[in-house]
Amino acid sequence: MKSNELIRLLQKDGWFVIRQSGSHMIMQHATKKGQIVCPNHGSHEVGKGLEKKIKKDAGI
């Protein structure tokens, strides 16, 4: 999955960017606890393990 596809998936689920540090977005949800750090490398692929971890943390 590409980085921009993962960000779109998170935003569709209700996650929004609270800040960005370099090429990483820190996202938060209105009702879910915690924050997610998501790489913002455009059309570059995100590793399968990292993709799985981010989805698990997001509850997707």
Where in the sequence are the language-model features?
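Basic nucleic-acid-binding interfaces
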Residues: 1-19, 24-26, 31-60
